[in-house]
Amino acid sequence: MRHVLGIDAGGTKTRALLAAEDGRVVADASGGGANLRTHGELAVEKVLHAVAEETSAAAGVRPDAVALGIAGAGRPGDAAVLREILRRIGFRDRVVVTNDAHIAFVAGSPRRVGLALVCGTGSIAWGRNAGGEVARAGGFGWHVGDEGSGFWIGERAIRQVLRGRDGRGPATALEAALLAHFAIADPEDIVHEIYGGDFPRHRIAFFAVPVAEAARAGDAVASRILADAASELVLAAETVIRRLGLAGAAYDVVLSGGTFRALPALEADVARRLSAPDAAVRHLEGEPAAGAVELAREALRAAAP
């Protein structure tokens, strides 16, 4: 029996599933975040090597094919680096490197027509039509993109607290939430935290949860941030729908990502706004890594004599 490895590498955590050729999972492992742009090549290699070794040790087998879903894989330069990382840790043949939305799409869309909208630390929309054409929107990283993501929500909340602090914006309950979440005494201390050294961006992304709590309690500033996040996510999805000509035929919309899981009201708002007669909008119940397993199985079958 041959085996395959599927890896979902996110900005906050990494999941790996080792499965038999028939798709039955025989081992799994979790690791830290793995993103070339924010963690660096060596850190990504360390995480991928660790989860691969852990699954192989648990099952007592080595995979015959591997598929990696990770942010940034759509850029040719990053994809080449990722393939080299996989080669260094022992995977030279039957290797698939793709973006994180692709594996979520495969995991959640049996017909493989439609799109995945991922909202985690970052965000991206990626889809495929019946003719095999693919399109994406967003996913350009936290400096210039990732609109609507956990980081985007957290960063805007911090901005609004500081604006309210110096009189450029309204007072907001987010100020107290900021102090508690980051364990600081004064809102301006967050500036020193962020610029003072290696400040993990996932800490800002995790601030999205207190933002949602403030919105539920009626804070207008927090509510506006979440409404804007939903609009950005819907825009990304609708852009992919338009570019692929999906409207008018049955298609899936797969919602995935840690921020969607942590902020169900945000996910529900996005799902409502993307509802259409032709669209089957669903939350991804399983793991995106299961989509990577399926892509690895396909690579294994394609290489069979």
Q: How would you name each of these model-derived features?
A:
Residues 1-64, 85-88, 107-113, 158-305:
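ATP-binding/phosphotransfer module of carbohydrate and carboxylate kinases, centering on a glycine-rich
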Residues 73-171, 303:
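Phosphate-binding/catalytic loop of phosphoryl-transfer enzymes
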